[in-house]
Swiss-Prot record:
This is 2-succinyl-5-enolpyruvyl-6-hydroxy-3-cyclohexene-1-carboxylate synthase. Its EC number is 2.2.1.9. One of its GO terms (molecular function) is manganese ion binding. Binds 1 thiamine pyrophosphate per subunit. Catalyzes the thiamine diphosphate-dependent decarboxylation of 2-oxoglutarate and the subsequent addition of the resulting succinic semialdehyde-thiamine pyrophosphate anion to isochorismate to yield 2-succinyl-5-enolpyruvyl-6-hydroxy-3-cyclohexene-1-carboxylate (SEPHCHC). Homodimer. Pathway: Quinol/quinone metabolism; 1,4-dihydroxy-2-naphthoate biosynthesis; 1,4-dihydroxy-2-naphthoate from chorismate: step 2/7; Quinol/quinone metabolism; menaquinone biosynthesis. It comes from the Bacteria. One of its GO terms (biological process) is menaquinone biosynthetic process. It catalyses: isochorismate + 2-oxoglutarate + H(+) = 5-enolpyruvoyl-6-hydroxy-2-succinyl-cyclohex-3-ene-1-carboxylate + CO2. Coiled coil: none annotated. It comes from Salmonella paratyphi B (strain ATCC BAA-1250 / SPB7).
Amino acid sequence: MSVSAFNRRWAAVILEALTRHGVRHVCIAPGSRSTPLTLAAAENPAFIHHTHFDERGLGHLALGLAKVSQQPVAVIVTSGTAVANLYPALIEAGLTGEKLILLTADRPPELIDCGANQAIRQAGMFASHPSQTLSLPRPTQDIPARWLVSTIDNALAMLHAGALHINCPFAEPLYGDMNDTGLVWQQRLGDWWQDEKPWLREARRLASDKQRDWFFWRQKRGVVVAGRMSAEEGKKVAQWAQTLGWPLIGDVLSQTGQPLPCADLWLGNAKAVTELQQAQIVVQLGSSLTGKRLLQWQATCEPEEYWVIDNIEGRLDPAHHRGRRLVAKIADWLELHPAEKRKPWCVEIPRLAELAWQRVVAQRDTFGEAQLAHRIRDYLPEQGQLFVGNSLVVRLIDALSQLPAGYPVYSNRGASGIDGLLSTAAGVQRASAKSTLAIVGDLSALYDLNALALLRQVSAPFVLIVVNNNGGQIFSLLPTPQSKRERFYLMPQNVHFDHAAAMFNLRYHRPENWEELESALAGAWRTPATTVIELVVNDTDGAQTLQQLLAQVSHL
């Protein structure tokens, strides 16, 4: 009997089972213990393979692939701390709903807790963060193949959102030629190998329950808050709110076109807050809100009803309103709850939104990061997509820009970390094959610098704008101690990214004005390659511009 041959047959059943649940992308890191899984994936023609030497980046690459494909994405890593490096991406997926299937190779039980090399306690190591966890036994012919395939099917059928962690112990030897070991065991699955359906099919439909009193509430004064959603959903929500005559407060990730732009500015005006107090119902579609003033208003508003609609299960209202938590796909929910055409009830807010926009436009000629955030819609590739980093840049775009309705926008706004942003953006581009504009800060770029390796081969033009304000300038907006701010919060690194781009053979520009930036972008969109554009800006100008605009708009 060949242990290595049966390991591979066992792994082949696992990987083939994944294909029956829509898995097409498999992300693989190098490793020895994961050899059975890696070879099974490599030999299965249903998969598109992605490789990366850094497991943390690999997990985020899978996250980006899942964001766009809307299908589960598999990740294969070896044992030990390689597994732990998947934690950040796993946590993000749990908060934003992307489906990740983490196949983690492990030592067999007799090598755990006895001093064996690269052997850690992997079973359950992710605590409550995976949506589902499955610890498989060591491969043995004593367990029928139908148990293995049905167990995988059951776990995937139960996976509504987030990550499934499948821990896979394998004994040595891990290498060797294939022989007939386990062939009969494998063939007992019969014509399943030629089929395309799961062995075990479980029905689990996410149904949208119609709110029977909607006809009553849609005649009231309402407010629509749009959080993270798809581009198609964003367009539908915008039309729905317009028909109702309700003001729409659109997040940067809502893709609604933000018909009342600069919400994070005008929500700081007492007149706007006073008018919003007249709302009898607030309907929030999508979660993960960005704007600070929006979150402050959300925390203090007291409508008669506050509804939150999102296809992710669980509590998504940090203000704990009295109302309804409705688990449904946004498009399906809108179809069940049609709008009734009514005149807009808000008068002051549209006026304030227009005045706030004019204040922002008046400052657009200055070369800086706040102005870049405002101008970003002018630099979007045609029929492309935008990936927005975290920290200051996403807040500036949310507050100062107005993105086109239905234009795809992606970000990691679950745990909102700056780790893995370049890797996630790489996954977004690979899954869509669209021209992609990604914008991050300098610390975010440094944090995930080796992800530039993932950007060496792209299927469409990819532009990475690194806004270099020399540190974490988000802390300039916070009441951090002035004497400790630079050393312990901002942490300026005084670096540039030309050498990093050169190391990975990527095109590089450092424009010093808008004309040079636009020229660099024009050339980049004509070439199916990655271009790194570094915007070196004054350290605190972005934060100061936002604070100045907030003060101006608050007194309108």
